[in-house]
């Protein structure tokens, strides 16, 4: 999977308060320390399969910002198109306020960059893309 930093020209664009938000696969950050100035957060509801917890250094694991279990299962069973998933997941984020809470925690840590980590294999159709877009709109 390509890094999402390379996928979009605006991928390093910041949000209010100067935070840069990036998206990457968990597997690309195994056995690496969190760099100074970065807040590294796992945004999957489930721990990534096959990854020992001691191999992934995190600043946070935010299960609340992940899609609901029902929505995740419906999307992964191919009952929803990515666009339908995007609409429903965005509605969940709007209703819960979890995205804003994530940004508030990141800002309180006095960091420049938030790295959203996901385990998804599909680089083009995953909740991380929707979450990042949602956060950039805040």
PLM features per residue range, with description:
Residues 2-138:
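Residues lining hydrophobic/aromatic ligand-binding pockets adjacent to catalytic sites
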């Amino acid at each position: 999977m390509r890094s999402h930093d390379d996928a979009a020209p605006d991928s390093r664009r910041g949000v209010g308060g100067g935070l840069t938000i990036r998206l990457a696969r968990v597997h690309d950050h195994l056995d690496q320390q969190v760099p100074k100035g970065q807040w590294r957060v796992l945004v999957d509801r489930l721990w990534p399969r096959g990854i020992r917890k001691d191999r992934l250094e995190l600043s946070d694991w935010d299960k609340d910002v992940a899609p609901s279990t029902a929505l995740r299962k419906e999307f992964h069973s191919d009952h929803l198109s990515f666009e339908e998933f995007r609409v429903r997941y965005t509605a969940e984020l709007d209703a819960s306020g979890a995205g804003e809470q994530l940004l508030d925690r990141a800002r309180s840590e006095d960091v420049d960059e938030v790295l959203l980590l996901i385990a998804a294999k599909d680089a083009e159709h995953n909740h991380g893309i929707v979450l990042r877009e949602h956060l950039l709109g805040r």
